[in-house]
């Protein structure tokens, strides 16, 4: 599972 913050950076 990935943290929400890391997930947001991944789609940027």
From Swiss-Prot:
- In which organism is this protein found? Kassina senegalensis (Senegal running frog)
Name it: Kassinin
List the subcellular locations.
Secreted
Known tissue expression:
Expressed by the skin glands.
Cross-referenced InterPro entries, in alphabetical order? Tachy_Neuro_lke_CS (IPR013055)
Physiological role: Tachykinins are active peptides which excite neurons, evoke behavioral responses, are potent vasodilators and secretagogues, and contract (directly or indirectly) many smooth muscles.
Does Secreted show up as a keyword for this record?
yes
Signal peptide positions are none
Family the UniProt entry places it in: Belongs to the tachykinin family.
User: What coarse category fits the chief subcellular location reported for this protein?
Assistant: secreted
GO CC annotation, single: extracellular region
For the keyword Secreted, the answer is yes
Q: Which GO terms describe its biological process?
A: defense response; neuropeptide signaling pathway
Task: Report the superkingdom from the record.
Answer: Eukaryota
List UniProt keywords, sorted A-Z.
Amidation, Amphibian defense peptide, Neuropeptide, Secreted
Which parts of the sequence carry Methionine amide?
A: 12
